[in-house]
Amino acid sequence: GKTWKAYSLDLKTNKDELASAEAELHGFITDLNNLPTDTSDESIATIKAFYEKWFDMDFFLKTYAINILLGMDDDYWGNGNNYYLYFDTGKKGTGKLYFIPFDYDNTLGCSIHEGDFLQNPLEWGRGKNRPLMDRMLLVPEFKQKFVDYLYEVSAEEAAYEEPVYEE
């Protein structure tokens, strides 16, 4: 849909605070959609400030690197679904938004899309308009960290480390 009201909000916690949750989500989506799409220094600074305000960037980038490693294309970036946004902005919260993917039945080669494992991980969404990822990748620092995490989670030694057992 063209507006955020076209989508349903399935509040999982604090259900008595639906109105404020809707307002917070609306503000986030509006700000995200109004971010610049060019790569001027001023635009990059604006985009970076937005992401650093809303996200724990290391957590977000690591989450998406793991999503890609698992071949999770039935998600926000691929199909625009199967994720939660958790706003930890209450009195005792971190003030951050957490992106939480779910529904991993189409992973590890069980995808309806052939050759997902051959895709460039920086173009995972197959050209779809996904402002959350598109804007983030415009920031060189975030893009590089994302690539670094992709290498880190796919490194052979990361998958085959000997477990350490305490006696």
PLM segments and residue spans:
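Aromatic side chains
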Residues: 1, 7, 76, 83-86, ...
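Internal "kinase-insert"/substrate-recognition segments embedded within catalytic cores
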Residues: 1-70, 122, 156
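C-terminal catalytic region of ATP-dependent kinase domains
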Residues: 12-15, 19-22, 33, 90-167
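Active-site acidic catalytic loop and adjacent metal/ATP-binding pocket
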Residues: 51-111
